[in-house]
Amino acid sequence: MARVKRGVTSHAKHKKVLKAVKGQWGRRKSTIRVAKQAMEKAMQYAYRDRRTKKREFKSLWIQRINAGVRSEGITYSKFINGLTKCGIKLDRKILAEIAYDSPEAFKTIVQKAQSALN
């Protein structure tokens, strides 16, 4: 039976790990064992924070909408209720963008939502 040598594959795996931890500090960037642990932990953080990012952006959008709406004298929840009643189907991302970039247009949307509530 032929002898199996795995030098090429293990070298490739090690290069892949070291490339992933490039920019780390100390032995995390040079020693395979420590670098592998650092890479796995970084991947865990990345996985977790890809989900956290969605929550954080949604809360940011809500804060921006709420700030714009309260300047018009209405609460966020009443504004969203008014939007659904008058049939305006804009998501929070777009509403926050409008409130941030063009307050005049946002003011008209708020007035339509208020008229739907009355």
UniProtKB/Swiss-Prot annotation:
A family per Pfam: Ribosomal_L20
Family matches, as InterPro entries: Ribosomal_bL20, RIBOSOMAL_L20_CS, Ribosomal_protein_bL20_C
Alphabetical GO biological process terms: ribosomal large subunit assembly; translation
UniProt keyword annotations, A-Z: Ribonucleoprotein, Ribosomal protein, RNA-binding, rRNA-binding
Taxonomy, superkingdom: Bacteria
Entries under CDD domains matching the protein: Ribosomal_L20
GO molecular function list: rRNA binding; structural constituent of ribosome
Entries under SUPFAM superfamilies matching the protein: Ribosomal protein L20 (SSF74731)
UniProt name for this protein: Large ribosomal subunit protein bL20
Taxonomic source organism: Pelagibacter ubique (strain HTCC1062)
